[in-house]
């Protein structure tokens, strides 16, 4: 056989084998990949809604924020949208341009602030409100309508702003420990917030992260992780498959508990600033007298723990280093319940035992030997 031909044959065989191996690796790695799609999006509405909205004009861009009108557009039934004024958000930089607009009887114009340093829009309503601004819209003239109306309405329900206290915290025992990357941590937390939103999951600040935001408008310097919670009924288990995929920008480190009992996930960013984030599921118990408590769980070996709260109300919004996060509407009440009346004083993390220090923690039974095999998973 011609030596040159022999070289070509062997090279061809080698390339073929390499191609087969690459294809095999590709499909094995891709088997967990999930296509994340924002649900309920639309870029159009009915002819009736289109005709009605085209019949009015506004000289500057405006965002429809009226809940009734948005629901009508989504349901494609706009017969009654002009029975009262339509609430719209106007960028405050354009406010003077609408001062004498002759359609003022149709619209209730609300100032809207769009700071480039923030990832949210703020509205001068009473009380003030804020929603994330990374949503798509479609336009009818100068009227802009959220493409994903159900998601926007969920954000609006959680948009009432709560402020933090920015207290000066004396740290004689922990002053040498500094969390110097608060902005980077908030940015990664915002990225994880957005991942959860693609699954229609709304998480809220909890535990020490809630305390740090409310007390000092940041993260507690000597904490090592970030705490989030969300209602168990809103959790979508598919997210665990996504977090195990190459597509995810976060790595799933572990899961604890079961979906109906003391479940939590720990994730960390794959790139950039690295900080662990714990996502706890929050459950609801209804007592015989009708009173409601909420709780999140924890576990140490086979012992289960339960952190209880009064009926939880995570329907408000907060700023943390220019990023929007959701929080309880009564932060001080919840912090007193968890940390006691001296919640505003620093407590070194080295002296904090999560199994006993909190005021709202108690044991909650044991995992059985069978359960123990499944309740703790490392990835």
From Swiss-Prot:
Q: What is its main location?
A: membrane
Biological-process GO terms, alphabetical: protein glycosylation
Q: Which residues cross the membrane?
A: 7-27
The way it spans or sits in the membrane comes to: Single-pass membrane protein
The source's superkingdom equals Eukaryota
User: Has UniProt tagged this entry with the keyword Glycoprotein?
Assistant: no
Cell compartment(s), UniProt: Membrane
Write the record's keywords in alphabetical order, separated by commas. Membrane, Transmembrane, Transmembrane helix
Pfam families named in the record = LicD, W02B3_4_N
**Can you name a GO cellular component term?**
membrane
For this entry, the protein name equals Uncharacterized protein T07A5.1
Q: Which organism is it from?
A: Caenorhabditis elegans
């Amino acid at each position: 056989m011609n030596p040159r031909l022999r070289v070509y044959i062997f090279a061809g065989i080698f390339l073929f084998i390499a191609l087969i191996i690459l294809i095999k690796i590709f499909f094995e790695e891709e088997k967990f990949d999930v296509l994340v799609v924002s649900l309920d999006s639309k870029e159009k509405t009915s002819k009736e809604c289109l005709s009605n909205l085209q019949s009015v004009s506004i000289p500057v861009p405006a965002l429809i924020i009226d809940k009734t009108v948005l629901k009508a557009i989504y349901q494609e039934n706009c017969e009654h949208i002009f029975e009262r004024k339509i609430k719209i958000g106007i960028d405050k930089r354009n406010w003077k341009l609408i001062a004498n607009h002759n359609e003022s009887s149709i619209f209730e114009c609300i100032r809207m602030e769009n700071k480039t340093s923030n990832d949210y829009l703020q509205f001068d309503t009473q009380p003030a409100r804020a929603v994330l601004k990374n949503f798509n819209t479609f336009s009818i003239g100068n009227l802009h309508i959220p493409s994903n109306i159900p998601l926007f309405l969920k954000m609006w329900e959680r948009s009432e702003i709560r402020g933090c206290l920015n207290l000066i915290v004396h740290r004689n025992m922990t002053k040498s420990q500094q969390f110097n990357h608060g902005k980077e941590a908030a940015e990664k937390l915002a990225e994880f917030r957005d991942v959860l939103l693609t699954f229609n999951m709304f998480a809220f600040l909890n535990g020490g992260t809630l305390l740090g935001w409310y007390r000092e408008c940041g993260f507690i310097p000597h904490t090592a992780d970030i705490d989030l919670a969300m209602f168990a009924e809103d959790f979508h288990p598919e997210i665990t498959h996504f977090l195990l995929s190459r597509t995810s920008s976060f790595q799933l480190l572990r899961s604890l508990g079961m979906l109906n009992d003391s479940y939590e996930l720990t994730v960390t960013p794959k790139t950039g600033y690295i900080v662990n984030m714990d996502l706890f599921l929050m459950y609801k118990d209804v007592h015989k007298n009708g009173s409601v408590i909420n709780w999140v769980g924890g576990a140490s070996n086979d012992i289960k723990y339960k952190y209880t709260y009064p009926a939880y109300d995570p329907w408000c919004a907060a700023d943390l280093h220019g990023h929007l996060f959701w929080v309880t509407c009564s932060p001080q009440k919840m912090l007193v319940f968890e940390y006691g009346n001296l919640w505003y004083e620093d407590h070194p993390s080295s002296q904090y035992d999560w199994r006993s220090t909190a005021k709202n923690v108690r044991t909650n039974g044991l995992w059985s030997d069978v359960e123990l095999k499944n309740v703790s998973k490392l990835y």
